[in-house]
Structure formats: C-alpha cells, structure tokens
Amino acid sequence: MKKIIALLLAAIMMLSLVACGGGNDEPAVDETQTIKVAAIETAYGSEVWANVAAAFTAETGIEVQLTTDNNLEDVISASMQGGEYPDVIHLATGRPAGLTEQFIKDKAIAEITDVLSMTVPGEDKLVSEKISGGFTETSLTNPYGDGKTYLAPMFYSPCGLFYNAKLFEAKGWTVPTTWDEMWALGDAAAEEGIALFTYPTAGYYDAFMYALIYSIGGTEFFEAVTHYEEGVWDTPEADTLFAILDKLAAYTHKSTPAQANNQDFTKNQLMVMQDQALFMPNGTWIVGEMAEAQTTLTNDFGWGMTALPAVEEGGAGYSYCWFEQAWIPAGAANIDAAKQFVAFLYSDKACEIFATAGAIQPVNGIASMLEGDNVMFYSIYDNGAKAAMGNFAAYTAIPGIDNTTVFFEPVNSLVAGTLSIDEYKANIVSASEQMRANLMG
C-alpha cells in the first residue's frame, strides 16, 4: 500500500519587520525547503525511514516528503514519466522491474562522488571516512568504470564460511587463513569422520565464488570474469580457481548434492551444526533460519563466521557482501539538498535508527551498535577481511544458458563425481563466449 508521509518538523520561521528609516519595509521570508524521498518497503518496514527522515529534518531544517511501498516502481513510475522525480530513491539493482538498471543504462542518475567529500550533517567526519573500505569501489556504485560514484551503498549483509565455534574450541583447531591450512584441517577432520565442507544448495556458490575470485586476482580478475572477457579462462588465475574448486569438491560431504535442493537444504546446514562438516557458505540470515533447529541440538554449538582464506600466506581473505543502493535521479529538482540527505544516511543517528530494524549500514565500527551474533558477523571487515562486491554483467537472454546453470549448479556434479573439472571449465568457456556476444549496454 502506498504510504506518503509528509514530515514537517522544522520550526516555523518567524517573520520579522525591521524599521529602515522611513523606507518601505519588506518581510524577510525564509521558506523551508522540502525534498521528496522514495524508498522501497522491505522487511525493515516503513517506520524506520520515517524516523530517519524526521532526524534529518531536525538536523538540517530540510523537510522530507516520504513515499514507501513494497512495489515502489509502480508508485513512482507514472510521475517520473511526466518529468517529476523523487529527489532521492532507495531502490537496489536486481529487482524484477529493473528500474534502477534502466536509469543506469540511460545515464539518468546524478553523480554523487562529491558526497564522499561532504561532512556528515551533525558530525565532523567526512562521508568517505564513515563508509567502510571498498563499498564505493565497485560496479554496483560506480557502474560506468570511470572512477565516479553514482549509487550510494546501503544495508549490507556479509556472507562467509559458517562453522561451529564450540567444536573448534574443543578440538583446539585454528580457523584457516590460507587454503593450504584449509586442506590440512580437512585431513585432520577426516580422521575424526568429519567432512571439511558442505553447502545448502549449489546456488550458495555465487557469493562463495565471487569472494574466491577476488582472493585469487582482485578486482581486475573479478571484472574480467564477470564481463566474460576473451581469454580470461586461460590465465594462471583461472587455473588457480579451478584447482581450488576441484579440490574442495573432494573434501565436500558426499551427501551434500542429494540434499542440495529447496526441500532438503536445511539438512546440509545441519551438517555443520551437528559436527558432520566443518564449513558451509552462507549469510547472516542463517541464525534466524536455523534458530528452531538449534534448540534441538545435543552437541555443544555456537555460530562462528570467517572470510574465505587467502590463496597465499600474507594475502587477503575476502567476504562477499550483498548490499542495496540509494541514488539521485539526474532530473531531480533539489539535487543539492538530496546530497545532504544521502550524506546523512551514514550519520551515527541514522545508522542507529536503521539498526533497530535490522538494516545495517556499511560504516566503520558498526559492530559497536549491534548485539549478539551480529557483533561477530558485522565486524568481519573490521578484523582484516576485505569486501568482495559485484556480480555478473547482464546480457540479453540466451536459450538454455544462465549464470546459475553454467557456473553454480554444476558443483553438484563435481562433488558427485559425474562431471570432471575439465568438462566444467569447457562448459564455462563455451557459455562465456555467448554471454560476451550478448552483453547489454
């Protein structure tokens, strides 16, 4: 349901008449500015946005007319077609309507690189000092590859490898920081009948593989892979990628593929909780998803989360991060005031309000505002891990080919032993050629 909330919280400006020695007196009128903000309503609700808007008005005097809806595209599209745009839109890429992607393609989003140099309203820090490293250096915020920022990162959820921290404590095991250490731990665990790895479904390999690609070759390799560049699969980095995937398949619990479906995936998650496997890729939602199952456990259990290990000693570990985006339409009427609002979204006040609804902003030190397991999950980047962000570039539809069936689902066959790593690579090379030929934009 459409919700339009007019927030008129600024004090009414007093009109004063000042005598000027017999001249005609003109009242000095300072009209309060109003901006329009449109935000997608998700599980976080609409009240959190109303509270942030009110806090912004109290800080700056700029009023906010707020629109929230779970089908936001339907609500705002008609007025935008008539040339009336919200000043700020919170709407991520990846939604079925593809509205944000269309604005990106049309280059109809205002550049906000200068917002990073702005002081956060009500604070003495710059926006760039508040946002965690890497979040404004991805194609999700800098879509044109020109070093300029157009979309602001919002509400993130880190992904990583989840494990039973109590088991590691009991066994005296150390969480691996390199893949060599991971293989050694896998051998030690196998002696006790515990597999090194499992996964809920092969679809969970998306965030896992993204982080792995970053850890092998950084942003350059990631961009080459996700844009299907010619020759990328014949590089040393690609050889390393396939070698790790092949070896990890051998260390994966053999019951995993049979249960890697929408009906039985929780059985694979229980493998970690019941000490049948050490690690699984997942996101912070796992705690709530398995909360009831945790009450039935008979073993000692506590959640642990770590980034993917580095490829070499001294290298960086990576954790993939899902996040949303806010942006300013190029046709907005109040771009300067809109930029102030975007800057305010990273204030301590706004972050605290968002956090009450479980919406976690990508700012440094956010863990200090959180409680329970969230402290561990959201401090992963404070503890040395780097954030992996981005996804595969879009291409026009190709019959029988999509990223999931080409890159992720074959993992089930790798683990089951019905597909070799060479066959897997050959299929990826063939599909990538078609994807490259059909790239959009």
Question: Where in the sequence are the language-model features?
Answer:
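Extracytoplasmic/periplasmic solute-binding protein
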Residues: 139-154, 159, 183-231, 268, ...
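Short, solvent-exposed loop/beta-turn-alpha elements that line the ligand-binding surface or hinge
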Residues: 111-130, 217-240, 293-298, 310-317, ...
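C-terminal capping/gating helix-and-loop segments adjacent to ligand/active sites or protein-protein/ligand interfaces
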Residues: 227, 320, 358-365, 379-437
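Glycine-centered hinge/linker elements that transmit conformational signals in sensory
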Residues: 187-189, 227-260
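Extracytoplasmic/periplasmic substrate-binding proteins
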Residues: 101-102, 211, 243-334
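Conserved N-terminal structural module of periplasmic/extracytoplasmic solute-binding proteins
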Residues: 6, 20-106, 122-128, 175, ...
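Hinge/lid segment of periplasmic solute-binding proteins
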Residues: 96-159, 183, 306
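Extracytoplasmic/periplasmic substrate-recognition and gating elements
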Residues: 54, 58, 81-82, 170-171, ...
